[in-house]
Design a protein with these regions (language model features):
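Active-site phosphate/pyrophosphate-handling residues
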Residues: 4, 33, 55
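Short secondary-structure boundary/capping segments
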Residues: 26, 65-66, 120-122
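Short beta-strand scaffold segments in enzyme catalytic cores
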Residues: 24-32
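Helix-adjacent hinge/juxtasegments
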Residues: 50, 54-91
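Short beta->alpha transition motifs characteristic of CBS
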Residues: 35-42
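Residues at secondary-structure transition points
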Residues: 23, 43-51, 79, 125, ...
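Zinc-dependent deaminase
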Residues: 1-19, 80, 87-154
Length: 154
């Protein structure tokens, strides 16, 4: 745990607000050095996935030329939404540090509690309708993957 890393994540969140973005920033740390930074770019890029943490993860993976961030930590200006938390698991980040809480974010209209609630529901109960179709055709790609001898597992 390093206050300087968190200070940088917070600086990025403040800079983001001043530049028209959302109030979120993050840094990725490996071997006690910042290797990547990110701030919220949702509105500037018209990309709803361009959260500060996601941008930092993308930058770190690009810098390391690896999809795995094992051995890395992330410092975020806020407790993560489900999207960013999932990205941390998928990228294998070792540890998450955060400053503001989900409740702090909710108070300024960044409320993601409905997503946490939706994830726990059965597919048939979710607000966005989900319909399965063409499974047999789609399974062909899975069968090819399963038989592939040179696949890179992730």
């Amino acid at each position: 745990m390093n206050n300087e890393f968190m200070k940088r994540a917070i600086e990025l969140s403040i800079e983001s607000v001043k530049n028209g973005g959302g109030p979120f920033g993050a840094v990725i740390v490996k071997d006690d050095k910042i290797i990547a930074e990110g701030s919220n770019q949702v509105t500037s890029t018209n990309d709803p996935t361009a959260h500060g943490e996601i941008v930092a993860i993308r930058n770190a993976c690009k810098k390391l030329n690896d999809f795995s961030l094992s051995g890395c930590e992330i410092y975020s200006s806020c407790e993560m939404c489900p999207l960013c938390l999932a990205a941390c698991y998928w990228s294998r980040i070792d540890k998450i540090y955060y400053a503001n809480t989900r409740e702090d974010a909710r108070k300024i209209d960044f409320d993601d509690s409905f997503i946490y609630s939706e994830i726990n529901k059965n597919i048939s109960e979710r607000k966005i309708p989900m319909t399965q179709m063409m499974r047999d055709e789609a399974l062909k790609a899975f069968e090819l993957w399963d038989k592939k001898t040179d696949k890179v597992k992730y």
